Amino acid sequence: MRKAIFTALLSLTAVAAGAQTMYDGLTFSQNNYYGTARSIGMGNAMTAVGGDLGSIGINPAGSAVAGYSQFTITPNLTLSSMNSSYSAYHVGGVDNFSNERRESLTRFSMPNIGATFNWKTGSGSGLTAITYGFVVNGTNNFTGKMMAGGRNDKTSYISSMAVAAEGYDMDFLNGYSINSNNERVDRGWDYPYYYPDDYTNDPNKGSYAPWNVIANVQAGALSNFGDSNDPAYYWRYIGATEIYEKTGEKDADGNYIYNISLPGALSQAYGRNVTGSKYDALLNVGFNFGETFFLGANLGITSLNYNYDEYFKEAAENPSAFEMDFGEKGKTYFSDYRTRYSYTADGSGVYGKFGFLWRPVDGIRIGGAVQTPTIMEINERWRQDVNVNYTDASFNGSAKTPEGDYSYRLRSPYRLNAGAAFTFAGMALLSADYEMTDYSTMKFMSKNGGWNDDTYGKLNDEIRNRMGVSHMVRVGAEFKPVPEIAVRAGYNFTTTPEYVSEGNSKTTLNDRTNAFSVGLGYSSNGSFFADIAARLTMLSDEYISPYADYLKDLASPMILNKRDLYSITATFGWRF
């Protein structure tokens, strides 16, 4: 099975409250834990280990395990590598991916910095120590860059925009409206971005037009076509990459029927660049009861920044096949087209997390934690521009949407995790964690709405029907050949929470993310210690559709994207 992610280029709408998808909620809610080099080196299997500042975000009780105060700082270098291939259309019912291309992007980050302060109560039993801490840990890295493309002689992005524009009046899309006296009034180029179509006879009268449709019309990539006496003439469209042929037949409404096709092949290219990260700032308190039982609590403040930039280009292989007749202005030929979409999201939220760690006997540790849902406020900004070029540059056109902005609230899901760890004579450590996250509990709300806010009713229903539980399993090991040196290794995998419907049943997509890590640690006889870790994260395959299917019996292009993240992390710390 596979999932297809449609790009924002085809879903940019005027109604901002309808532009969010369940994948936005998933992107902003998912955790790909970073932390210290020690925790990364052990696969973040730290629920029952503790003592490390990277473990505090996984189990708050971990801060109480260390019988000392400490400070750590952790720089990180992450390399994203993406292998992308392109299929113009189905061949024999399946995609034929080719033209594989690799792109990489490197980013520096600081996935951990913080300190804990240990206070001895002086009691020989009961509560023997309290630890206070402030720690910032990275919980996701959005870095990624990709490019893909190929030859297509069947479908076109501009053609898909022509289909999306059907039903909207050309005058409205260019900034005109009808006043109370039924007169045509110029409202300005940006009018259709904020107001519904009000032309009297439009099929879409009262509807908001998609922003990408408006920009394509205003750039001159789309136009009305055919017999101007047809009743539907002013709200049917053809793209600059298309030609039409009159059949001589009419439909039931009296409009002539036309055959529309591409007159030649196009060279198409899609590219995407994503940067950003998510962090949790933790106010922590941990309680040590006789070195046997530990409790902890976090007040977590989540912050995220997500920057998404994508483009789509198509150019005529033989422009002379793409003749364009502009009437009295003359004729020219389509050359090339480019559209670009830029999107930024910033968010913050608050949650609570509570955990315990228990040593029933020497050498065995058991731990668990529960995290409340995070209530986040997300602030979005976006813009799209369109450029269309012809062999005669005097016909070239361009358009840019206004900068859109919108804010809403997202309730991310709760998390439960449990773990066990085994130590062997102070020389070796084995640990294993299980974490579950129920993404069906995600919920979108308007910024000022309450829990029963119905603004996102349909989207929240879709989340409940198509999202479920994601399972994460983490295992780690540490071996000390000498007291000062530690060798580490770890592995974890995370399953997708997404379901697909098959008849009356739902089946989980068979996708998962795998991560492999190794690490080394040095601990001096004094206060200084240092760790280094390397991790490879292999994300699940991604299938991208750069524009919607618009022909009944022919699919639009599909891109297969294979994504890997390589990271090198170093931690420098001092105990006091």
Regions of interest found by a model, annotated:
Residues 20-34, 39, 118-576:
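Outer-membrane beta-barrel porins/channels
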Residues 37, 49-58, 64-146, 150-153, ...:
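Outer-membrane beta-barrel translocator/receptor signature
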Residues 9, 66, 305-307:
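Active-site-proximal flexible loops/turns
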Residues 11-12, 68, 435, 442:
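Hydrophobic alpha-helical membrane-insertion segments
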Residues 1-24, 572:
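Bacterial Sec-dependent N-terminal signal peptides
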